[in-house]
Amino acid sequence: MSNMVEIDGSFGEGGGQIIRTALSLAIMTGHAVGITNVRARRTKPGLQPQHLAAVRAAAAVCDARLAGDSVGSRALTFEPQTTAKAGNYRFDIGTAGAAPLVVQTVLLPLTQAAGASTVTVTGGTHVPHSPTVEYLEAVYVPLLRRAGLDVTLSYTNAGFYPRGGGQMDLVIQASTGPKPLVMNERGRLEELRAFIITSNLPEHVAERGAVTVERSMKAVGRKIIIERRERPSPGTGAAAVIVARCQQGMAAFSAIGELRKPMEKVAEAPCREFMQWWKSTAACDKHLADQLVLPLSFATGLSHWTTPVVTEHLRTVLWVVRQFLSIDVELEEHEDGSGAVSLSPA
């Protein structure tokens, strides 16, 4: 076992992203990791059930020894005993905890396994403070595939707060590692798509969402494909997602329905975020900018991408990666808040 990497969980954004990134890196490098001050900057610090689900999922992939793996724990030790093992995995978060975040914790390590793996995660697919499953399906996974990783994702049931019960299914093939990606500029807009997702709601709710999107996106001057998705779910819920696919760049914007929040308001929110991004020159949205760091840290050459905003999440994930890997990192920050990331092997 390699020397333990010590991570201060209060660094930067001080939330669950530090835990998930460190777990993935521990599996992929073989280093044990000790995390203190877990989620120190959150109103409820320490491990919560959805973070514990990510810890247990990561441990299953590499037979890790664990200490501090309990709800409320503010210190965690994770010691991989093997490299990532191919297998058929099922992880049940048991709540409306974010299934996409558990997926992102184990996905990249399993591309290093000796064979193909299947992963099924049940929990929340459309919940606050997490990518939606459509975000992974339409942006994150396609970019992994562009980088040469063989990953497919589908989902049947949607999971909304508080019931959860959504299901995501992945097939992950073994890979020799990602190729670098360069997204200096977004290039020509090739496809604009909207997803209107509803579960156990009257048909007019989805219709109102679609009408709102069509009206709100007229200023772009491009045809938008609107796909309505009625998904089975233990509870009720709605979401709207806007996806832009360009020659180089990609971006997506999501909003989740809430009790007594009209569908028009839900659908307007991602349209408004898209328009803000569209006025910038960035190739990626601000969330994709930090989600690309982990996979492209293992790429064989120089990767470069631009972001409309340099977020604390981006600074934090770059810091965590540098605790494990010897890579050259350059983060440009401009006066207007936008920036660019460059990563390459040292």
State the predicted function of each range.
Residues 29-46, 116-120, 155:
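Glycine-rich phosphate/pyrophosphate-binding loops
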Residues 52-152, 169:
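A generic, well-ordered mixed alpha/beta core segment in the N-terminal half of proteins
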Residues 65-69, 116-117, 148-158, 217-235, ...:
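Flexible, glycine/charged-enriched surface loops at secondary-structure junctions
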Residues 84-87, 92-96, 112, 139, ...:
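Phosphate/diphosphate-binding glycine-rich loops and adjacent basic-rich segments that engage nucleotide
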Residues 128-131, 155-169, 228-237:
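Beta-rich nucleic-acid/ligand-interaction surfaces
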Residues 129, 146, 178-180, 185-286, ...:
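Conserved mixed alpha/beta catalytic, RNA-binding, or beta-rich assembly cores of soluble enzyme
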